[in-house]
């Protein structure tokens, strides 16, 4: 079968010649003169070639009716005839027949100069004429992608191969074929091969529709066959049975039933293929004591390394000494105590250090530090030693896979790894990856090459161009966690492939994580009830005038940005406007006093956060040399969404800052005192605010009810705490304060004084310094002075007192000024909390992300 081949003749006259032919479905041709144009029923593109300066149009498939008109400009020779053979009705293919035109006097063996410089797309039919009238064009750059799609389809079926058939032998003479340049022969073979694959075109159309994450999956399996049945094997392996371990003899404190189960699970998990796991009990359920019991339940040889936030280091040491009767020897590897030999350090049972120290010694070992003689590198003792076990407290601190702290922690050497976190997934599914990488969970935390057998736990591209292991490009590598879980969830949410990815996440977590909540274990815990209230007050007349002036000015600026469509471009300005309004709701002096410079200007510029205008707590510095509170700049970046294209709120250039960098070391307590707001205002004529007086009223009522009740007052602004401290002392309350300018020993002494001194009834705590890793069960009342749209920070603060050991009913009061931005912030906080609870770890929007719509809501009347 096949259509007849018709010759296309042209006159040999000089000058301009018009040639027109019509090739119908039966292969019949007709001639007619016309101007240059190309018409086709379905607008099929034609391949334009040039023969000795003459242009002609050659269809790659003739199953459609083609009308081709050409207006050729004559040169020395006329256009030779072209014979076209229809191949669309065959499963095979034949090359184009080119014969000599007797009218021209040229033989078919003549050397022909063919070019295809005008060819912009190659037509590749991906479906047969009988199945579809649709066709697809594939660029030159996509030709390799077509082959890869076919290979992927081959992997998908696993029972048959999709082959590209070879072109059928040409019906022309051998001399005719040889007369065509090799470059054109090669191109025609490729085009012919694709056109001849119409028998399998339906399969290729389906292959093209395979989502990118599935194509990555098939390519992974092709290069790494061991990954084919990972999830089946994981499902077959039942989660470890949880039993109760016997009470360790050296442990003074009696473990609760669920805590004994936790210790048993930790022991079994260390013996599993994962070599550890994540203990994710809700905050306040005794993760620390369960870990101490684990240390006592095994013979001790090499030391165990405990990495915790600075504020929690002394608490760990105190609990180990108290609950084990000093059966475990501990060493605090921090500050000046880092000058110790490896042999001496190995003699201790437990080594305690902070994330900041781990990052600092790792950076000095890898990158070095500048001295007069150049860059000096210093070996890290912690990274040279091999520990028996490594425990990460508040492990969500390494949730960012790209931060240097995460790299530093993953560089430690051990075979047993435990993560402790009440919130392992705070905002995004992607936060789980850093914990998996620390656990060295195989294959979930590894990077794989799609072109060879290369496999690595870390992203190793020293020159940012080629893999250090195999030499292939970054685009040829993928993370198994991303390919199997993160990408499908990001793209599809909780539907289709996204739902399957969620099931994979849950299946994995069942094998590496143990989580119990207070509600589930209420009978074991016996915790008292907790009541959460919001107290709403109104500005007085003077405060409202000042606030409205600031609010209207801020709203005018925001509306200008909104009208011009540059809200996100001015995000730093808007964030500062919101911060100023929050401060104004606390006390007008927080905003007005920020403009008064009564201390050394240069000194203050170095220690004041550029976001909140407070003394920077847990201070870190950006690449543009501006100082921020770690919490302030973290919230600032998180509120922007993905953290990309965020500008510095001070100089407005792109912000570059390491959120995990160690705190600046030159922030002494004396500097904090000198920069206090009390040194910038006249306290003799100072007047309190509505919110501070509301707090004083609540504390008076508590003291009248029971003088032994203790309270904690949380605020994000240290200047607000300074004003509260001054006012409460005037009112006769004995209180202490914890902020970011205190050393670990000073913090520990302050906490001990509050816990043991019955005369100290109020603890003023900065959210930036004491929101996590504190055990303050001596208090039963909590006052939140300034609400924030991300309620997670406040929830963690509440759990500082609602935990094991609490005997009194808990009451949490959030103070809110009704006619201010705070009322809308609370509404926004509730809306976001409902969104998180209504979805399963939604990945597209973080809990603390502040969208344009949220900003509009905050600035609405």
From Swiss-Prot:
Domain Helicase C-terminal: 695-848
Annotated residues for binding of ATP: 281-288
Comp. bias regions, Acidic residues: 131-145
Cellular component terms (Gene Ontology): nucleotide-excision repair complex; nucleus
Biased composition (Low complexity): 83-95, 193-204
Similarity annotation: Belongs to the SNF2/RAD54 helicase family.
Protein name (database record): ATP-dependent helicase rhp16
Gene giving rise to this polypeptide: rhp16
């Amino acid at each position: 079968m096949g259509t007849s081949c018709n010759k296309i003749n042209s006159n040999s006259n000089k000058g301009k010649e018009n040639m027109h032919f019509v090739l119908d479905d039966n292969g019949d041709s007709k001639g007619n003169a016309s101007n240059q144009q190309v018409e086709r029923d379905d607008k099929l593109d034609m391949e334009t070639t040039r023969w000795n300066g003459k242009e002609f149009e050659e269809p790659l498939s003739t199953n459609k009716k083609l009308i081709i008109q050409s207006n050729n400009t004559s040169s020395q020779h006329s256009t030779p005839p072209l014979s076209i053979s229809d191949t669309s009705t065959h499963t095979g293919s034949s090359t184009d027949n080119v014969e000599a035109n007797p009218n021209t006097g040229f033989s078919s063996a003549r050397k022909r100069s063919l070019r295809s410089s005008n060819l912009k797309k190659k037509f590749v039919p991906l479906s047969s004429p009988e199945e579809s009238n649709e066709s697809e064009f594939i660029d030159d750059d996509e030709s390799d992608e077509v082959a890869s799609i076919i290979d992927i389809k081959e992997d998908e079926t696993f029972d048959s191969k999709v082959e590209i058939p070879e072109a059928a032998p040409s019906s022309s003479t051998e001399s005719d074929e040889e007369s065509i340049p090799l470059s054109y022969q090669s191109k025609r073979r490729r085009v012919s091969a694709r056109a001849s694959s119409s028998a399998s075109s339906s399969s290729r159309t389906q292959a093209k529709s395979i989502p990118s994450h599935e194509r990555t999956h098939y390519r992974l399996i092709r290069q790494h066959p061991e990954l084919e049945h990972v999830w089946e094997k994981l499902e077959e392996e039942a989660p470890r049975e949880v039993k109760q371990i016997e009470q360790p003899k050296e442990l003074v404190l009696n473990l609760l039933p669920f805590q004994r189960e936790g210790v048993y699970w930790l022991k079994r998990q260390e013996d599993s293929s994962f070599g550890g796991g994540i203990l994710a009990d809700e905050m306040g359920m005794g993760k620390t004591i369960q870990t101490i019991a684990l240390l006592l339940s095994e013979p001790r040889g090499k030391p165990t390394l405990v990495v915790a936030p600075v504020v929690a280091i002394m608490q760990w040491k105190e609990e180990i000494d108290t609950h084990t009767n000093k059966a475990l020897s501990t060493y605090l590897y921090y500050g000046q105590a880092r000058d110790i030999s490896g042999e001496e350090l190995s003699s201790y049972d437990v080594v305690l250090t902070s994330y900041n120290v781990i990052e600092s010694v790792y950076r000095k070992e890898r990158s070095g530090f500048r001295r007069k003689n150049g860059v000096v590198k210093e070996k890290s003792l912690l990274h040279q030693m091999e520990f028996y076990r490594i425990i990460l407290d508040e492990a969500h601190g390494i949730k960012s896979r790209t931060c240097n702290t995460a790299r530093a922690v993953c560089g430690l050497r051990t075979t047993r790894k435990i993560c402790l976190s009440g919130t392992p997934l705070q905002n995004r599914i992607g936060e789980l990856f850093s914990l998996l990488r620390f656990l060295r969970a195989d294959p979930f935390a590894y990077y794989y090459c799609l072109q060879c057998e290369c496999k690595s736990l870390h992203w190793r591209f020293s020159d940012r161009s080629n893999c250090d292991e195999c030499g292939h490009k970054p685009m040829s590598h993928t993370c198994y966690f991303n390919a199997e879980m993160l990408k499908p969830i990001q793209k599809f949410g909780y539907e289709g492939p996204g739902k399957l990815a969620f099931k994979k996440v849950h299946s994995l977590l069942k094998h590496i994580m143990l989580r119990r909540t207070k509600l589930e274990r209420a009978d074991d815990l016996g915790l008292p009830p907790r009541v959460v209230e919001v107290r709403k007050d109104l500005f007085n007349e003077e405060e409202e005038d000042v606030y409205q002036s600031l609010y209207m000015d801020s709203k005018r600026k925001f509306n200008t940005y909104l009208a011009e469509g540059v809200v996100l471009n001015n995000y730093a300005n808007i964030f500062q406007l919101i911060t100023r309004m929050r401060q104004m709701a606390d006390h007008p002096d927080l905003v007005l006093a920020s403009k008064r410079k009564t201390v050394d200007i240069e000194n203050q510029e170095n220690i004041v956060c550029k976001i909140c205008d407070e003394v920077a707590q847990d201070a870190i510095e950006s690449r543009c040399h501006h100082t921020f509170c770690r919490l302030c700049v973290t919230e600032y970046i998180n509120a922007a969404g993905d953290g990309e294209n965020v500008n510095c709120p001070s100089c407005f250039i792109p912000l570059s800052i390491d959120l995990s960098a160690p705190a600046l070391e030159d922030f002494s307590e004396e500097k904090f005192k000198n920069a206090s707001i009390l040194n910038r205002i006249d306290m003799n004529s100072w007047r309190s605010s509505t919110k501070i007086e509301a707090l004083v009223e609540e504390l008076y009522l508590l003291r009248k009810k029971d003088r032994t009740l203790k309270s904690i007052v949380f605020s994000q602004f240290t200047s607000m705490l300074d004003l509260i401290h001054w006012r409460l002392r005037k009112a006769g309350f004995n209180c202490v304060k914890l902020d970011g300018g205190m050393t670990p020993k000073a913090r520990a002494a302050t906490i001990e004084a509050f816990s043991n001194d019955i005369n100290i009834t109020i603890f003023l705590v900065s959210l930036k310094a004491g929101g996590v890793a504190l055990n303050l069960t001596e208090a039963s009342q909590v006052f939140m002075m300034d609400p924030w749209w991300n309620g997670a920070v406040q929830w963690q603060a509440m759990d500082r007192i609602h935990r094991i050991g609490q005997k009194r009913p808990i009451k949490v009061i959030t103070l809110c000024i009704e006619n201010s931005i705070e009322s809308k912030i609370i509404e926004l906080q509730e809306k976001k909390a409902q969104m998180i609870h209504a979805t399963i770890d939604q990945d597209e929007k973080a809990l603390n992300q502040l969208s344009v719509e949220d900003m509009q809501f905050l600035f609405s009347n």
